[in-house]
Design a protein with these regions (language model features):
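N-terminal Rossmann-like FAD-binding beta1-loop-alpha1 element of flavoenzymes
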Residues: 2-29
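Conserved N-terminal/central alpha/beta ligand/cofactor-binding core
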Residues: 32, 38-107
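Short N-terminal binding/cap micro-motifs at the start of the first secondary-structure element
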Residues: 13-15, 36-39
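Generic structural signal for short, solvent-exposed loop/turn connectors between secondary structure elements
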Residues: 1, 24-25, 44, 69
Length: 107
């Protein structure tokens, strides 16, 4: 079994941990803050706004400045992909006003 250490328990670090564990790795996540993923918990007025379910071009258009620089990255791993990943790992989601995606649990 492979052993993987991930530095940082933010959204990217936690998702990297899920991905590595899915492939059978033993994962350790090292986070300097007391609670991993804490910034995610404060998005959407404390309800964990995960993503936006709108069309990718609309999302890019609404990014301040030049959102087009994110075009290739978002096409590689889209808003639909993150929702699918989370739901495949047991997190039910819901879409609310403005196409905002939240966990059904609101946390």
């Amino acid at each position: 079994m492979s052993k993987v250490i991930i530095i940082g328990g933010g959204a990217a670090g936690l998702l990297a941990g899920i991905a590595a564990a899915t492939y059978g790795a033993e994962v350790t996540i090292i986070e300097k803050m007391r609670v991993p993923g804490k910034k995610m918990l404060i998005t959407g007025k404390g309800r964990c706004n995960i993503t936006n379910a709108g069309e990718l071009q609309d999302i890019i258009k609404n990014i301040p400045g030049n959102g087009r620089f994110l075009n290739s990255a978002l096409r590689q791993f889209s808003n639909d992909d993150i929702v699918c990943l989370l739901e495949c790992n047991g997190l039910e989601t819901k879409v609310e006003r403005g196409n905002r995606v939240f966990p059904v649990s609101d946390k």
